[in-house]
Amino acid sequence: MSRKVLFQLVLPLIGLSILFWLLAFAPGERKNQPALLEMSVILRDGDGAVSTMRRGMEQAAEDLNVELRFLTPTADNSAAEQAHLLERETAGGTQAILLLPADRGVLGEAVSAAAGRTALVTVETDMTEWGAGAAVTMDHQALGEALGEAACNGVPTGDTVLLLDSLPGDNGIRERMLAARETLERAGRQVRIYQWSADTASFTDILRIERPGAVVAFEAAVLAEAAEMARSNESFPLLYGCGSTPAIAAALEEGRVTAIAALNVFSAGYLAVDAAAALARHEDWTGVPTVAFSIVRQENMYDNDNQKLLFPVT
């Protein structure tokens, strides 16, 4: 037998041996990986403020062999449309669902119905009382109080603080605002609530009329918009709020934002997928820890712990 023919016979055998080794012994132990799990994620809106949380979800999905499908209402923060999406995904047999609720009052019935048919985890707003299997949230009461106290440090007694109400309804974002209002009023500050919208002219008018000493936003997207307005307005009030996006970190560094409640939203996204996957697969599960936050100012934004909150993904 010629050397050439022998080579042609042996080469495929070597290839098959390598393939067998990869399948049987390669890192990751593919043969022990859990079966692929389909999971739907129902967002409140399509804003980029959830991008860090989404990266956390995607990292968990890669680690846990989960296929994610992101769904967004056509109208931002439409709880009614979220309820429709929840009913549709449940009826379609989705194995697990993550939901960022816009309004408990509107979504309660749909959540209760879905929770009996699929693994359902809510993010940001707790709906375990309606039957959700778990909730990945932060302490909204403590967060709102902390922002209220921060604003008190910058605004004298008797002066006005303007709170931006960006998500009407029964939800975690509103819990933050109500806690901040209570803290400010108890400390002797005047509180005004402004219904946030895309109408920047209206907001400018409110600032001119009320002349607040500080403005507080309770969502990252709203804080980022207000910080951008402050760029071209030297008389803009002190600005406080929730969020830890790159745009907000830049505004904090430049002094356009006075202080923020920085949230570990990457961790929130990861924990949500992890919890839903464990519930869907009927695995042993110890519960979800409360998502951490920290009040961050320009002078301490580069502390190690705060860096992890501001820049959780490199």
Model-derived features: positions:
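Short, solvent-exposed amphipathic alpha-helices that sit
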Residues: 49-64, 143-147, 168-190, 225, ...
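Hydrophobic alpha-helical segments within soluble ligand-binding/sensing domains
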Residues: 135-160, 244-248, 263-281
